Amino acid sequence: MYDAYTPCEVALRLPVEVTCLAFQESNQTLLAGGRAGHLYAYTISANRRGFELTNICKSFHKKAVMELKVCQREDLLLCVSDGQLMAHKLSDPEYKVETLIHKVKPVQTFARFSPKTSGDLYVIVSSRKKLYLFKWGEKDGHKEFIEVALDYNPVFLDTPTSIRCVGEMVFFSVRNEYFSMTMQKDKTTTSPSEGSTPEGWNGFVTRLLNFNCQPGIVPMIDRRRVAFVRNEIVVTTDIWGQRPANVLSDEYKFSEVPMQIVYDSPYLVGMLSKGRVEVRSIFDGQLVQTMSLPKAMTLCSGARGQVFVAALSDIWILDTSQNLRKNVSHLIQERHFELAIQLAENSNLFAEEQKLEIKKKAALNLFNQKKFDESFALFGEIKTDISEVLSIIRMFPELLPDGFQSMTGVVSDMPANDRMRALLALGSYLSEIRTEHAKHIELYNRLYSSGAAKKTDEDEKAKLLLTLRVVDTTLLKCYIKTKPMLVDSLIRLQSNACTFEDAKKILESEGRLRSLFILYETRKKHEMALDLFIDQSSRPDADPFFDDAIQQIVEYLQSLGNSNLPLILKYAKWVLAKNLEAGVQIFTSDETEMARNLNRKAVVEFLKSECPDALIPYLEHVIFKWEEPSSYFHETLLEFYVARVNTLFKDYVHAFPDAFSDENITRAGDEDGELGLYRKRLLKFLEVSHSYSPQTVLLQLAPHAFYEERALILGRLKQHEQALAIYVNTLKNVPAAEEYCRLYYNAHDETNSQVYLMLFRTLVHPNQQQLHSIPYHADSTPFGSYRDDVSEASTLVNSTSSYQPDVNTAIKILAKHADKIDTVGALNMLPATTPLRVVFSAINAVIQTTGRQASTRKMEKSVSQCAMSKKLERKNKAQSTKIIVNFSSECVVCEKKIAVSAFVRYPDGRLAHLYCHNDSQGGNRN
């Protein structure tokens, strides 16, 4: 026990009996109501030694003042006297009556109700077994209490007493029971200022406790609890009226039933019989102080650390400030740190450093009591500079970073289970510290980027970085021991301040290779990360994380970007040797823009020298997927296509020597195996690409093979007759020739518009187009030297051979495509001996086509004439419109005079400057 409060006189031997007290905190004034209806005001003296009487209002009321309540913001003093609730003007020396509630009488008690959702003043009044709700507002031009509908259940058996409000909760007693009522504004109603529907509230009543004594309800706002007197025990609930799971955790037992209690953190002060006052701690309920004041019977809370006590004609103040320093020192010595901290926090007598020192001692005491969570929660309230953090971590010297372990500290020898709990609490504490420091560092970085940083900011940032380095390194070790699943998340943090060497050493010593890889990745140690993957991929006992090493390396390389191209090429060589397809994915990923933005020429040169087999799939992706237009890549792909086809063709000819004889020519792409596949791809590329040199490719292809390829290239050169001769005479494939014509026909091109006529000529006069334009020399072809076992007669196209005309097919072509062929020219090409019956079908088709074309032209002419006539009509109408422009004519856009400027006229007759009209039209388009 110790003397928490020192009693001092406020007023002694008053001529009236004191019935109630109220404290006005704004001017430190105590208001005392008397049985004779007088009101006394005592204000703290100028020298702050005692109180002095500053006002007496003998006309305050005619009868005893039973209850007082100060409403500072509204400048009201609420009072119950003679069963009526009245509102007096607080700032008036005579305390003039502002209003009174006539409707409710007699008033048993009342309480101020201040919902969080509203700034208005409400009062809840108890009278005749009911509760009433009134709102302070304006009515008929003056302020008064307006009744608000309050709907609640059940009906009370007696009049409620001892009402207290906390937020939207109302606590009260009826007979020997305590109740709570949850207040909720009726959403179907409005306040009078918002509409015609009157405001209303609903109350939901719940029974809490029963008791057999004088009721007492005390809100403990800072602890978010409410205390209820229940005989000699004071029990508490939360602010919603719910009891804690541990019923005994917040119960305070007085030596006898208190008649009245007040809460003055960290104490509960109870008024007992015979003027005895008992003070108990709210932390453990222990008795702190007992004092006796003659005939004391009324308590009232004052400023923090003050309680007023009234007897019949005497008033005292119980003050904690006089013995505060001595009491705090005593509590620290007795290890009652919670009380010491609360007293220091409530007072301005202690500097901030002193408060932090008390908290530090309290936290260490909790740690020694193995209350680790509470200990580190308190450490979290302490200013966390590097020295403070180190002093905490010294309790775990094995966690200190290198360079700090020489600092000595007392190591608690505790069981493994307790040490694990301590490490868990330490981890939570360090996590909060690192989050706070990272935010401050980010703030300093923003100051630097904006140019607003000062020299002191730079020093402060350096301290924060050092603290964060210690915290992160310790937290890494702590997580490894307690929460291994969080190690990787900690390493991935962008603000992680662990030095690379410290983190690497820690992870290697623990064998956490997966986490080590993440460290390499986040710190951009790319070579170390890739070397780790390659090394682990060959180990049978490696972590499952490294099982799919090739794919992991591919994804890693894909994320590096063009700035790391030499590194990508270095490790791509290893991937290509292991898996060609995976190696190509390094350079062709569509997941990010990294691969797309690589230097493509450098990649091509690398693949040429290191892995030519990967070049074709890479270039196909670049050209077809990424639509690369550069001729360099197109010609390189063609070069490798031709080289691959040449190699495959050599093997194919040796295996199937008769496949390319004059009697049995295998069509391009129909060959078995890779040759057919690559020839199809080559043909498609020759057809769709426009970024290569046809002459260069033509020289790479032998004249005795690759006929389809040569035909497509000749078409690109507009040498259609030679190309069609290949399809018709060599390949005997008229449908392919017809498809060729469809591909190249263009009615607006002088040469390409004649392609169908050229096909007709080739069919009618096949011997006029010989393949003599490109001489053939066996030793100059890409594969001429390796065909010694194949007869030249079976592969060469004989330049002197004769082809038979195919008039019937030509006539069919003419009939099918009569609209694309010069009919007269085609008919003139037919041999004179051609029977008329053969030509009839073609002539009939020509006539029908000509008729359709004539009808189409006639219809087009009619439509054009109709449109022209309408245009002329509109033109004539516009020209006949009279436009009057005078000196008063204004522009509808800028509202200036038209004068002699160029102008436009709108359909409704309005005028505008031409440039204003153009500007407005341009703005609308934008």
Curated annotation (Swiss-Prot):
InterPro entries: CNH_dom (IPR001180), Vam6/VPS39/TRAP1 (IPR032914), VPS39/TGF_beta_rcpt-assoc_1 (IPR019452), VPS39/TGFA1_Znf (IPR019453), WD40/YVTN_repeat-like_dom_sf (IPR015943), WD40_repeat_dom_sf (IPR036322). It is found in: Cytoplasm; Lysosome membrane; Late endosome membrane; Late endosome. Signal peptide: none annotated. Residues 15-306 form the CNH domain. It is a peripheral membrane protein. It comes from the Eukaryota. GO terms for cellular component: cytoplasm; HOPS complex; late endosome membrane; lysosomal membrane; membrane. The keyword Membrane applies. GO terms for biological process: autophagy; endosomal vesicle fusion; vacuole fusion, non-autophagic. Disulfide bonds: none annotated. CHCR repeats lie at residues 590-768. PROSITE patterns: CNH. Probable core component of the homotypic fusion and vacuole protein sorting (HOPS) complex consisting of the core class C Vps proteins vps-11, vps-16, vps-18, and which further associates with vps-33.1, vps-39 and vps-41. May interact with lgg-2. Interacts with cuti-1. Plays a role in vesicle-mediated protein trafficking to lysosomal compartments including the endocytic membrane transport and autophagic pathways. Believed to act in part as a component of the putative HOPS endosomal tethering complex which is proposed to be involved in the rab-5-to-rab-7 endosome conversion probably implicating sand-1, and via binding SNAREs and SNARE complexes to mediate tethering and docking events during SNARE-mediated membrane fusion. This is Vacuolar protein sorting-associated protein 39 homolog. The lineage of its organism: Eukaryota, Metazoa, Ecdysozoa, Nematoda, Chromadorea. The gene is vps-39.
